[in-house]
Design a protein with these regions (language model features):
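Flexible glycine-/small-residue-enriched beta->alpha junction loops
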Residues: 1-38
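Short coil/turn connectors at secondary-structure junctions
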Residues: 2-5, 13, 54-57, 87-90, ...
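Non-catalytic beta/alpha edge segments that cap or flank active sites
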Residues: 5-6, 13-14, 22, 45, ...
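Short beta-strand segments
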Residues: 7-11, 62, 116-118
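Short acidic, glycine/serine/threonine-rich loops at helix termini
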Residues: 18-22, 70-75, 104-107, 127-128
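A glycine- and small-aliphatic-rich helix-loop capping segment at beta-alpha/alpha-beta transitions
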Residues: 23-27, 75-82, 132-141, 145
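Glycine-rich phosphate/diphosphate-binding loop of Rossmann-like nucleotide-binding domains
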Residues: 25-98, 110-113
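Glycine-rich phosphate/nucleotide-binding loop
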Residues: 104-182
Length: 182
């Protein structure tokens, strides 16, 4: 695709990546999806503030609230509330993630800013990287309340080491994001 201009905002402290797992009985394991109102409101507020400052037009929450009514429902409700109460000037939509994936690969231009919980954000960020050439050309950042880290996402590529194939573009674009952040 040419001209894809997406921003992906991912809550990355909760969800299934919280690491709350246990073995219920031999051969049966369980992971717990964690969602707190505080974290959901924090990322929604940050996303809308960021989109507004960058003069973006629309935020889309991709979710599975039709199935995960409590966790994804809370995430969606917090985003909807932040929109209604603080940023009604921005367009807002919610889309079931399955349909959102299909729409993304069919026509990514219909999206502007994507707001996702942790696992979905991990998967969708890779999908979107594929739309523009792969992980090697996509910048990344982890924005905290006190500290931020700007990085080329997904680490190293030892499989192409020494072959003169790697591109520093993701690192350079992440550096540009860092400089624009301050």
């Amino acid at each position: 695709y040419k001209g894809v201009d997406l921003i992906i905002i991912r809550e990355n402290t909760e969800g299934l990546y919280s690491g709350v797992e246990n073995e219920v009985t031999p051969g049966v394991v369980m992971s717990m999806k964690v969602a707190s109102k505080e974290a959901c409101q924090r990322i929604a507020t940050w996303a809308f503030r960021f989109a507004n400052r960058r003069e973006r037009k629309k935020i889309t929450v991709l979710h599975k609230a039709n199935i995960m009514k409590l966790t994804d429902g809370l995430f969606l409700k917090c985003a909807s509330d932040v929109h209604a109460n603080d940023y009604p000037n921005l367009a807002f939509e919610s889309t079931i993630i399955d349909a959102g994936c299909m729409k993304l690969v069919q026509d990514p231009s219909q999206f502007d800013v994507l707001l996702l919980e942790n696992l979905y954000g991990d998967v969708i960020s890779d999908l979107c990287a594929g739309l523009v050439g792969g992980l090697g050309v996509v910048p990344g950042a982890n924005i905290g309340q006190d500290l931020s880290i700007f990085e080329a996402v997904h680490g190293s590529a030892p499989d192409i080491a020494g072959q003169n194939l790697a591109t520093p573009l993701a690192l350079l674009l992440s550096s540009v994001m860092l400089l624009n952040f301050f």
